[in-house]
């Protein structure tokens, strides 16, 4: 697992006088932390993908960091899709996690100081840049739906506080009552993730197809990752970010229609 160290912080207050801080972390970084100065009324803003269709399989978000800077910020324009992680926090609570988007460096640095906008995407959005890799080099095997789901979440490298999964499907009423994880026994051939030219799907496409099959919506919201079943009224598994343990949460943990950041 990759380690990230904080390289920049951006503290600011909202219009409602709430204190927030943006932490920009660099993969493998162990140096000193510098404080940035925010620009404008909204140094950090979040936008969630909008879709009027209730059963959309994924709804991920983007964010923008606005700072007053000079040429030392050139390093933030990375070609690596998970090189700079961004955690947006209220107090000690992460309310958004993602990465600075890889893009070409185009800012004009002729002035001593300037306003700079840095574009970010939520952690799950970075799966667009990660191709599916088969389990073994020799041949394509069968893989469980649980392996696919957990692999995609872990590959996102997001600092999610928890992962919510609906307790919906089971082989039998007895298995449902016993909280058996049916996704562990549901398998699919890896061949489905490669086209006729053997080109792989990316992991964002994989999680999207998985959610279509299960009739779920995957959404990152207020620091956690949710797999929402719009028609579910029962319990949700609340997993730790590494899927090592879970607790139960009552139904209706999140309404897809009400997703927004204030």
Give the residues covered by each predicted segment.
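Short beta-strand-centered aromatic/proline hotspots
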Residues: 96-105
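Residue-level signal for glycine
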Residues: 30, 92-94
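Charged- and aromatic-enriched interaction segments used to assemble
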Residues: 109-254, 258
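Residue-level detector of short, conserved catalytic/binding motifs and their immediate flanks
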Residues: 63, 84, 98, 208, ...
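Juxtamembrane "anchor/assembly" segments of surface/extracellular structural proteins
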Residues: 1-79, 111-155, 261
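Short coil-to-beta transition motif at edge beta-strands of beta-rich domains
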Residues: 76-89
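Surface-exposed loop/turn motifs at beta-strand-loop junctions within extracellular Ig-like
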Residues: 90-92, 214
């Amino acid at each position: 697992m990759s380690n990230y160290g904080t390289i920049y912080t951006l503290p600011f207050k909202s219009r409602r006088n709430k204190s927030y801080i943006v932490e920009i972390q660099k993969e493998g970084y162990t140096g000193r932390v510098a404080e940035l100065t925010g620009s404008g009324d909204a140094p950090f803003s979040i936008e969630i993908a909008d879709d009027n269709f209730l059963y959309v399989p994924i709804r991920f978000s983007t964010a923008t960091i606005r700072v007053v800077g000079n040429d030392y910020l050139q390093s933030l324009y990375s070609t690596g899709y998970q090189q700079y992680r961004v955690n947006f926090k209220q107090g000690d609570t992460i309310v958004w996690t993602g990465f600075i988007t890889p893009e070409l460096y185009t800012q004009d640095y002729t002035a001593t100081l300037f306003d700079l906008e840095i574009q970010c995407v939520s952690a799950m959005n970075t799966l667009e840049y990660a191709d599916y890799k088969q389990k073994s080099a020799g041949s394509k095997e069968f893989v469980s739906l649980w392996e696919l789901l957990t692999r995609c979440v872990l590959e996102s490298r997001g600092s999610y506080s928890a992962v919510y999964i609906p307790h919906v499907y089971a082989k039998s009423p007895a298995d449902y009552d016993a909280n058996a994880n049916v996704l562990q026994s549901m398998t699919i051939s890896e061949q489905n993730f490669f086209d006729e030219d053997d080109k792989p799907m990316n992991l964002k496409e994989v999680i999207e197809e998985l959610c279509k099959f299960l009739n779920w919506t995957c959404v990152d919201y207020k620091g956690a990752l949710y797999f929402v079943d719009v028609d579910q009224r029962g319990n949700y598994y609340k997993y730790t970010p590494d899927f090592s343990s879970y607790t139960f949460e009552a139904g209706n943990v999140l309404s897809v229609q009400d997703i927004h950041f204030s």
